[in-house]
């Protein structure tokens, strides 16, 4: 079964997503709660959502918050020989992770698949054929960054006018404005 892939990311105006292994902006509690809700809440009883992330993204999560709770966590790494402490699975590549999900043991447990970073994992997911959604929080300010979100190809990806559970209005926390957007491609 080919499942839609969902990438979720917060980006600054200069497309920054990270700085020194952390977020480039101060912690935004409501934005973080949106991430938690979107990636955790499953619409199917008895199933869990699954998050896929690169090794650096995994280690950027404070240890007390690893694994991301109430979600199946897959870490991607070509170097690691076994899943890092707390991770449920390790895969060498995104393709391997997606194959793993189709394993009979996992396939019936997984509802929605979320890609949560970093840059190269997002890029690979965005270039995959098929149904891909991008849940983008647009932080309406520039922040110095050393990790960036790949360019969105607007020929392929269309901005949806609305999406269930995604607020439409501009949000503000700590003097920082941001808005939630959802893009989709289906080819």
Curated annotation (Swiss-Prot):
InterPro entries: DHFR, DHFR-like_dom_sf, DHFR_CS, DHFR_dom. Substrate binds at residues 31-36, 71. Pathway: Cofactor biosynthesis; tetrahydrofolate biosynthesis; 5,6,7,8-tetrahydrofolate from 7,8-dihydrofolate: step 1/1. It is found in: Mitochondrion; Cytoplasm. It catalyses: (6S)-5,6,7,8-tetrahydrofolate + NADP(+) = 7,8-dihydrofolate + NADPH + H(+). It holds the Pfam family DHFR_1. Its EC number is 1.5.1.3. Keywords: Cytoplasm, Methotrexate resistance, Mitochondrion, NADP, One-carbon metabolism, Oxidoreductase, RNA-binding. The keyword ATP-binding does not apply. Residues 4-185 form the DHFR domain. GO terms for molecular function: dihydrofolate reductase activity; mRNA binding; NADP binding. Homodimer. Belongs to the dihydrofolate reductase family. Key enzyme in folate metabolism. Contributes to the de novo mitochondrial thymidylate biosynthesis pathway. Catalyzes an essential reaction for de novo glycine and purine synthesis, and for DNA precursor synthesis. Binds its own mRNA and that of DHFR2. This is Dihydrofolate reductase. It comes from Bos taurus (Bovine).
